[in-house]
Amino acid sequence: MTDFPSNSIVTLEPLIEAVQEGVLAAGWQLSGLQKTTSHQFEGRWDGESTRSAYLFFHLDAGPQDVSIDVYLDETSRGLMGNMALVVDLLELQDLGRMQTSLGLLGELSEASLPEGHRTPVSLRLRLREAGDDPGAAEAQVRFKLQLPRATIGAGHVAIVELAQATVQAFERLLEAEALRAIMPPVG
C-alpha cells in the first residue's frame, strides 16, 4: 500500500504528459523536449540522482521573441517544476530605471497569474560580448508559476487544468499594453 492517492503523479513522464497536454490544448506548439538524468553528486546531494525535463513551446502566429519554457524535476524528494513565459524586452538603455521596470513586471504578473501559487519574476540582462556598451544589454523577463506539490499529487486532470489556466494567464500578460510598450517592435 502506498501513501499516494490512486490518481497521484509520482514519476516524471506522467507529469510531462499532463503539462504538455494542457499547454497544447491552449493552442501553443511544442518546440522541443529535453530529458536529462544526473548521478554521482558530491556533498549535500551525495547519493542522489535526478531526472529532469525541459519543454519549450511557441505560438505559430505569435511573436518570435516569446516562448513558454517548462522545467520539471524528479528527485528522491519528489516532483517539482515551473512554467515560465519568456519575453525578450527592449535593450537596457530603453527600459528606463531597473527598479521601476521590475516593479511594473511584478505588478503585471500579480494581476495576471493564477492566485494562490508562487509566481516569481526574473529580469535577466546579457551583454553579447564582455566589452559591449552596457546600455545595449539584452533584457528578458521570465514570468513563472511554480507547480504546487498538492496539484501534482492531485493527478493528471489537475495538472492539465493548471497548465491551461497558466497559459491563458500568460496570454493575458502578452496582451497587456504596459508589457507591449517594453517589448521590441514586431517585424
Residue ranges and their predicted role:
Residues V19, F56-L59, G81-L89, A163-T166, ...:
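Extended low-polarity, hydrophobic cluster-rich segments
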Residues E21, A25-T36, L108-S122:
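Short glycine-aromatic motifs
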Residues L24-M80:
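Amphipathic, interaction-prone secondary-structure segments
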Residues T2-S8, L12, K144-G187:
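Long, solvent-exposed, polar/charged low-complexity segments
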Residues H58-V157:
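Intrinsically disordered, low-complexity regulatory segments enriched in Ser/Thr/Pro
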Residues N7-G32, A163-V167:
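Amphipathic alpha-helical segments
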Residues G22-A26, L92, L108-A111, R172-A176, ...:
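Surface-exposed polar/charged interaction patches
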